[in-house]
């Protein structure tokens, strides 16, 4: 399992879920492991949001970016800052 504790930003997603879209651009922690759900947690002074996806199918890295595809076909792009 890979855990990124800070300064990880959700850059983009193919998800159209109304609960996911507001998380784009937010900084949080990322827990990622192939064959397990992706977990992205963000915290603001007012609330904490947790994104938990379906099972991760593929993980890719390019520079400071992480590309994730779930078994349902949804894609997520994260960036270290």
Question: Where are each of the predicted segments found?
Answer:
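N-terminal non-globular leader segments, chiefly Sec-dependent signal peptides
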Residues: 1-63
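Short, compact, well-ordered microdomains
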Residues: 57-81
